[in-house]
């Protein structure tokens, strides 16, 4: 039996079976048939068993071969010519055409080869990207680009990079085709973020024109001469802590609470040049060397407290050693030989020689408490250190030798900041005793003192937690930072601040706009309870004085009482009034029955929405209450009309009287909770925004739907506003985007993406309806110009 199993006929059958699927000729099918016939005549029992097992698959193979043979006879009469760009499927091609298609030739050289350019380097070139980009943000096919496959792939990668970095729009249209657009006109920056008992770092460029500081998750570069002009960097994912200009003035290095340092272009488009993980904790300070090549960043980490790197590659150029607790400050000598100094909570000042930077010596017997600031003088001859023990120590900038202590007993609080004058003969300090002092190095005493805040008051908000003496200026200006976030412009020789720049430190949660005597004013409230008014023409802000809300401001509304009155509600469950002309709180707070969901005002009536009712106020006093059949989420008013939105997606339109609301119509607006409402200027239409990002418009007269096509937002609608003519609606959302919608052409809109980091909280029209202002979680107020509305 074993001989029969390995007979020649069986071997031929096995060989034929192994070649099934590889042969597609008619000869192979004939050989297979002969092998099958030969095997069937074999008398061996084992061979018959093997035959029966393989019979079904063999028959199927033979049938497939027969079908293929018949189809080839028809191919002669079904030839088809294909051109480049035709839509086809592989099974449409004959074998001959498939071979021809597979032999198509690609160009050996193309435009990039001729010009010796790398397509990957072209991602910044808008003209090149536009030439090779389709209207849907994709690269054009090779039949149109004429590129080699390698360069085609490289250019596609460059295009994806440009879109990812925001250099190219994902849906591209040439500028001449764009009929309407929205662009930033000005950014009214947030105030620096501060923490009680901690220093806040300020930095100025070499020309003394711009100020850099950290606020929330952004970095702001602010004009010193015109604080209404600013630039915002938003690439950090965590709370930002420090920002420093490079001596060259072309780059900024910034750190955050996650231990990340980012280096970015501060002259061009703000492109990030590098991102480096320094410590696994908070970055407290960083410093550049005089060549703008090396950075030392320090903070609070578990494995190390700082690191030295090159800004362009992140390569290590030294180690930070000699400390046992977190570091608060660092400085690098700008002259050679390079020196560096660090200090922190371990009360020790450590000197390094570089580069690469290595430990040289540590001084632990001078300060008796935390050290908050060290800085080399511009000429490199001195080093000064200050701290929570209220002491000021001077050292030799080259050797680290201690020169002595000055100003003992002058400051009555922790010294949080120090900065040198450009002549290296004087420096300035900022302290928690509310004072800023200028010191003469040679005399060893203070030459001028400013006391910030009200006379005789020791308000915590007036603690001075940071200071910078901008170089390159001829007016002897220095800038100090209060714990409240106010920037104080101080000029040597003058007793009072020349200017105080105010703003918001926390997320702006509410916005209202008023116009009195053709002067437009914005009113903003923030998460920490601060309310400010802004001059739209100049972009300057003033904080409202008096006893306000201790926390979250949930809404602002305007009435025509007297010379104008602003009403505010907060999460302290109170409603308060503000005299618009005096810019101060008036009267006492009125207690609400529950947490406010929103506030709106008619001519003289104020409505405060709560979960179970709408409270009615006149002249600061409660006059009535309206119980709703649903849980109220928002409220709007215009003249004698009011609208209440509910958790169930319904909107109730009511008439306002002095003490009650009279229902007029019920609208089933959405399946989702209503989040925002706005009446048109003539009260003929009502715009409705819901929790899922939809915006709808209804007629007030009969509740009929006008449009439900405005669905581009992807998160809760936080604010809606009509332009003065009632033709367009602007919407803001937690998705960070702003849209301008056309009532006449519901399918047309203008989009502004990433208007505010982490969400837009308020929008309004200004300057006659040609510009928009917005506020958001980044604590900034931004003005946008809208062109070509239809």
Enumerate the language-model features and the residues they cover.
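A short helix->beta-strand "capping" segment at the edge of beta-propeller domains
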Residues: 182-197, 226-228
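Conserved strand-to-loop turn within each blade of WD40 beta-propeller repeats
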Residues: 215, 255-258, 298-302, 342-346, ...
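WD40/WD-repeat beta-propeller blade N-cap
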Residues: 192-197, 234-240, 276-283, 321-327, ...
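N-terminal mitochondrial targeting presequence
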Residues: 1-49
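Blade-level signature of beta-propeller repeat domains, shared across WD40, Kelch, NHL, RCC1
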Residues: 760-790
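WD40-repeat beta-propellers
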Residues: 219-223, 261-265, 306-311, 349-354, ...
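Loop/turn segments within WD40 beta-propeller blades
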Residues: 202-208, 244-249, 287-293, 330-338, ...
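Mature, matrix/stroma-exposed regions of nuclear-encoded mitochondrial and chloroplast proteins
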Residues: 36-143, 153, 157-181
């Amino acid at each position: 039996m074993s001989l029969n199993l390995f007979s020649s006929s069986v071997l031929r059958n096995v060989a034929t079976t192994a070649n099934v699927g590889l042969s597609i000729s008619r000869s192979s099918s004939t050989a297979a048939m002969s092998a099958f016939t030969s095997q069937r005549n074999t008398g061996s029992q084992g061979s018959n068993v093997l035959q029966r097992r393989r019979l079904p698959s063999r028959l199927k193979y033979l049938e497939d071969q027969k079908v293929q043979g018949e189809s080839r006879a028809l191919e002669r009469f079904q030839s088809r010519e294909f051109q480049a760009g035709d839509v086809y499927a592989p099974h449409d091609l004959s074998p001959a055409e498939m071979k021809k298609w597979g032999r198509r030739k690609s160009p050996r050289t193309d435009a990039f080869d001729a010009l010796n350019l790398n397509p990957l380097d072209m991602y910044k070139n808008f003209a090149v990207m536009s030439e090779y980009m389709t209207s849907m943000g994709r690269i054009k096919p090779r039949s149109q680009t004429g590129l080699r496959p390698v360069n085609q792939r490289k250019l596609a990668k460059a295009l994806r990079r440009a879109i990812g970095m925001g250099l190219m729009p994902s849906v591209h249209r040439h500028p001449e085709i764009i009929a309407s657009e929205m662009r930033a006109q000005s950014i009214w920056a947030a105030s620096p973020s501060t923490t009680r008992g901690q220093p806040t770092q300020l930095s100025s460029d070499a020309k003394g024109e711009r100020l850099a500081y950290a606020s929330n998750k952004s970095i702001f570069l602010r004009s010193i001469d015109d604080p209404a002009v600013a630039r915002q960097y938003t690439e950090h994912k965590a709370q930002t802590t420090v920002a420093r200009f490079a001596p060259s003035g072309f780059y900024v290095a910034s750190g955050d609470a996650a231990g990340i340092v980012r280096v970015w272009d501060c002259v061009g488009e703000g492109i990030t040049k590098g991102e480096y993980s320094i410590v696994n904790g908070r970055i407290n300070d960083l410093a550049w060397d005089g060549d703008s090549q090396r950075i030392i960043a320090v903070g609070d980490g578990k494995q190390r407290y700082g690191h030295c790197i090159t800004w362009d590659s992140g390569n290590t150029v030294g180690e930070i050693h000699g400390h046992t607790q977190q570091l608060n400050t660092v400085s690098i000598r700008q002259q050679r030989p390079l020196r560096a100094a660090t200090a922190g909570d371990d009360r020790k000042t450590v000197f390094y020689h570089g580069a690469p930077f290595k430990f040289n010596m540590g001084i632990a017997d001078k300060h008796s408490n935390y050290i908050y600031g060290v800085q080399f003088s511009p000429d490199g001859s001195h080093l000064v250190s200050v701290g929570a023990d209220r002491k000021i120590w001077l050292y030799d900038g080259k050797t680290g030798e201690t020169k002595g202590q000055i100003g003992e007993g002058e400051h009555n609080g922790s010294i949080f900041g120090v900065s040198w004058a450009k002549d290296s003969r004087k420096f300035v300090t900022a302290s928690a005793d509310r004072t800023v002092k200028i010191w003469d190095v040679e005399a060893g005493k203070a030459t001028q003192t400013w006391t910030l805040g009200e006379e005789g008051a020791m308000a915590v908000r007036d603690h001075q937690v940071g200071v910078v003496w901008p170089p390159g200026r001829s007016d002897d200006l220095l800038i100090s930072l209060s714990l409240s976030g106010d920037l104080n412009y101080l000029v040597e020789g003058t007793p009072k601040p020349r200017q105080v720049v105010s703003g918001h430190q926390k997320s702006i949660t509410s916005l209202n706009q008023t116009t009195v005597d053709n002067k437009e004013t914005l009113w903003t409230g923030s998460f920490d309870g601060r309310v400010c008014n802004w001059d739209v023409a100049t972009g300057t802000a003033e904080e409202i004085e008096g006893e306000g809300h201790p926390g979250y401001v949930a809404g602002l509304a305007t009435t025509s009482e007297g010379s104008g009155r602003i009403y505010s509600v907060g999460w302290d469950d109170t409603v308060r009034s503000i005299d618009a002309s005096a810019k101060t709180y008036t009267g006492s707070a009125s207690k609400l029955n529950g947490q406010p969901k929103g506030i709106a005002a008619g001519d003289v009536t104020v409505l405060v929405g709560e979960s179970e009712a709408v409270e009615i106020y006149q002249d600061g006093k409660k006059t009535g209450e309206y119980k709703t059949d649903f849980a109220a989420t928002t409220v709007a008013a215009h003249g004698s009309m009011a609208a209440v939105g509910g958790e169930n997606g319904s909107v109730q339109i009511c008439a306002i009287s002095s003490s009650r609301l009279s229902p007029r119509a019920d609208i089933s607006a959405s399946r989702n909770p209503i989040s925002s409402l706005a009446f048109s200027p003539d009260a003929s239409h009502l715009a409705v925004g819901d929790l899922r990002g939809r915006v709808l418009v209804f007629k007030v007269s009969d509740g009929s739907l006008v449009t439900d096509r405005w669905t581009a937002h992807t998160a809760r609608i936080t604010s809606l506003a009509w332009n003065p003519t009632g033709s367009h609606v602007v919407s803001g959302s937690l998705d960070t985007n702003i849209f301008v919608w056309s009532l006449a052409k519901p399918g047309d809109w203008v989009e502004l993406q990433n208007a505010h980091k982490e969400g837009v909280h308020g929008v309004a029209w200004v300057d006659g309806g040609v510009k928009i202002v917005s506020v958001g979680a980044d604590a900034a107020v931004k003005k946008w110009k809208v062109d070509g509305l239809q």
